[in-house]
């Protein structure tokens, strides 16, 4: 069984082709700068050389046609016939309260996705474009939607309600949703395998630390709390996002700086986080290098990030009444020993202790705890694309 996985952004389309008999990746690639001058495709067949094709790509429908051509090409393709694809799995950022799991996409689902656009105006439209392009290029092939928010739909009301008039939840669905759900779900499953215990018997805290970052509390395989909220802006200080802050800062900045609400929103999403704090970069490697050279703002910025992650882990230890393991994943979580060490430094009270030698690992599944740690600390590379393919396969009953 072969499944195509699609992840559409506003000007990009990333894809992978899976052979689900052994979960091997047959090919992967991306089309960048859709609708912008200088668009191109990078295609990488398994065991083959990367192919780059520069071509004007006007929209997502044209981009999807390029993907179809690439994966069926006689020279660098991996399929003899497009009919070998039995399903297309789509990453969808926001499913609102409509979706607590993955679904086969029909007209009702498409209408529901349209109704969620106001909750994710930047992310959901390109996700929808990708689905429409896939349906146009591959009519009759099942399309499966896998939602970043779905995994967190098991959160109880005490975790997702905001302390604002209840009517806004009833009228506008204003609540905490959480994101990175596919990643949190995948690494929790892998952690259970690594620990040799059923997921249903475990209490886990998963830390997805990349340019976007979130922490989740998982009890018996279900999300019970997570750091992101109505949008991905809430929670941790991130690459360019502010994370949680006093909401009155918004009006304060509007008054003091003469800014519009849209300008403040842009600042909080694209000019804040470690970029805004440091004034240097949203790349932690740059910040670590600057801090090592004595840059005080870079050093302070790193400390703010470490501190906020540690605080969320601490709060979720309380929510779960302890945890069996802390899991680090995504770009920073998988590849930065210094981040993992700094985040866990003040958590020894909870039996969380990192072995400095084991912690030097990058991008590999590893238990980095000391032998006497009562709470394990794991590094688990995420694989959201494989999780989407598995969800699609499961829905087709194969």
Curated annotation (Swiss-Prot):
MF terms in GO: acetate kinase activity; ATP binding; magnesium ion binding
CC cofactor: Mg(2+); Mn(2+)
Active site: 148
Compartments it resides in: Cytoplasm
UniProt gene name: ackA
Pathway listed: Metabolic intermediate biosynthesis; acetyl-CoA biosynthesis; acetyl-CoA from acetate: step 1/2
Swiss-Prot/TrEMBL site (Transition state stabilizer) positions: 180, 241
Reaction it catalyzes: acetate + ATP = acetyl phosphate + ADP
Sites where the protein binds Mg(2+): 7, 384
Cofactor binding comment, as recorded: Mg(2+). Can also accept Mn(2+).
Function: Catalyzes the formation of acetyl phosphate from acetate and ATP. Can also catalyze the reverse reaction.
Protein origin, superkingdom: Bacteria
One GO CC annotation: cytoplasm
Binding site for ATP: 14, 208-212, 283-285, 331-335
Entry protein name: Acetate kinase
EC number: 2.7.2.1
Subunit structure: Homodimer.
Residues holding substrate: 91
Family label: Belongs to the acetokinase family.
InterPro entries, A to Z: Ac/propionate_kinase, Aliphatic_acid_kin_short-chain, Aliphatic_acid_kinase_CS, ATPase_NBD
Top-rank EC class of the record's enzyme: transferase
Keywords assigned by UniProt, alphabetized: ATP-binding, Cytoplasm, Kinase, Magnesium, Metal-binding, Nucleotide-binding, Transferase
């Amino acid at each position: 069984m072969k499944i195509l996985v699609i992840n559409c952004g506003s000007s990009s389309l990333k894809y992978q082709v899976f052979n689900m008999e052994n979960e091997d990746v047959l090919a992967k690639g991306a089309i960048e700068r859709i609708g912008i001058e200088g668009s191109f495709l990078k295609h990488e067949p398994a065991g083959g050389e990367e192919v780059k094709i520069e071509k004007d790509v006007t929209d997502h429908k044209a981009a999807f046609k390029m993907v179809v051509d690439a994966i069926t090409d006689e020279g660098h393709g991996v399929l003899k016939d497009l009919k070998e694809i039995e399903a297309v799995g789509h990453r969808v950022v926001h499913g609102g309260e409509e979706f607590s799991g993955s679904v086969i996409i029909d007209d009702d689902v498409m209408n529901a996705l349209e109704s969620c656009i106001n909750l994710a105006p930047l992310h959901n439209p390109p996700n929808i474009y990708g689905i429409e392009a896939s349906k146009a290029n591959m009519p009759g092939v099942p399309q499966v939607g896998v939602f970043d928010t779905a995994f967190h739909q098991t959160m109880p009301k005490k975790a997702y309600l905001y302390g604002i008039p209840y009517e806004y939840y009833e009228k506008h669905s204003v609540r905490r949703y959480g994101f990175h759900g596919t990643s949190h779900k995948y690494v929790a499953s892998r952690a259970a395998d690594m620990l040799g215990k059923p997921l249903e018997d475990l209490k886990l805290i998963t830390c997805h630390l990349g340019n976007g970052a979130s922490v989740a509390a998982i009890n018996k395989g279900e999300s019970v709390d997570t750091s992101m909220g109505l949008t991905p802006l809430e929670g941790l200080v991130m690459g360019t996002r502010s994370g949680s802050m006093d909401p009155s800062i918004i009006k304060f900045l509007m008054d003091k700086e003469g800014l519009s609400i849209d300008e403040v929103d842009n600042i909080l999403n694209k000019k804040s986080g470690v970029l805004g704090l440091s004034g240097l970069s949203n790349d932690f490697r740059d910040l670590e290098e600057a801090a090592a050279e004595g840059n005080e703002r870079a050093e302070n910025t790193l400390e703010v990030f470490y501190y906020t992650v540690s605080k969320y882990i601490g709060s979720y230890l309380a929510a779960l009444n302890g945890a069996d393991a802390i899991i680090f994943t995504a770009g920073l979580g998988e590849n930065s020993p210094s981040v993992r060490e700094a985040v866990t430094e003040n958590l020894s009270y909870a039996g969380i202790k990192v072995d400095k030698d084991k912690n030097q690992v990058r991008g590999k599944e590893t238990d980095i705890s000391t032998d006497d740690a009562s709470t394990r600390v794991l590094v688990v590379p995420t694989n959201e694309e494989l999780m989407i393919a598995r969800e699609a396969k499961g829905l087709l009953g194969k």
